[in-house]
A protein has these predicted regions:
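Topology signature of small-to-medium multi-pass alpha-helical membrane proteins
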Residues: 2-141
Length: 141
């Protein structure tokens, strides 16, 4: 009889990972942590944690509320997907990053004052593309 533990192949086999693949997984986990913090920040805004009196979630304009709920959900979903190094995690995170940059650039009156997020998100996207390409180059055909 076969041992069931030897039949199951790990999702990410350590013996066949290259240097850039390990770096990619590390990068994805770091970005997952950042996405988790961003998602929790938005949930704190929804829950009113740290908000001055009179500036609760329902006192803010509807566009701010909708955007905050969107990022509260998508950032946490992206964090899970990135942590698992799943392909859908990268797609969800790229959607969140591009959406955040778009909101900051095109609608500064909604969140306003955080233009530093645009180059930060852009730098992370460029780094993601670079590390992903390097990891793909080291895989055998």
């Amino acid at each position: 009889m076969t041992d069931p533990m030897t039949v199951i192949d790990p999702a990410h086999g350590r013996e066949q990972e290259g240097l850039w693949t390990r770096r990619l997984v590390l990068f994805l986990r770091i970005v997952a942590g950042l996405s988790l913090v961003k998602g929790l920040y938005h949930w704190a805004g929804i829950a009113g944690i740290g908000a001055p009196p009179g500036e609760a979630f329902d006192a803010n304009p509807l566009p701010w509320q909708a955007t905050t709920v969107f990022f509260a959900v998508i950032d946490l979903v992206a964090a899970v997907g990135l942590w698992l190094a799943a392909a859908w995690g990268g797609v969800v995170w790229l959607t969140a990053a591009i959406s955040m940059a778009g909101v900051e650039l095109l609608f500064p009156d909604i969140f306003g004052g955080r233009l530093w997020m645009v180059p930060a998100e852009l730098a992370l996207v460029v780094a993601y593309i670079g590390v992903t390409l390097m990891a793909a180059r080291e895989r055998p055909e």
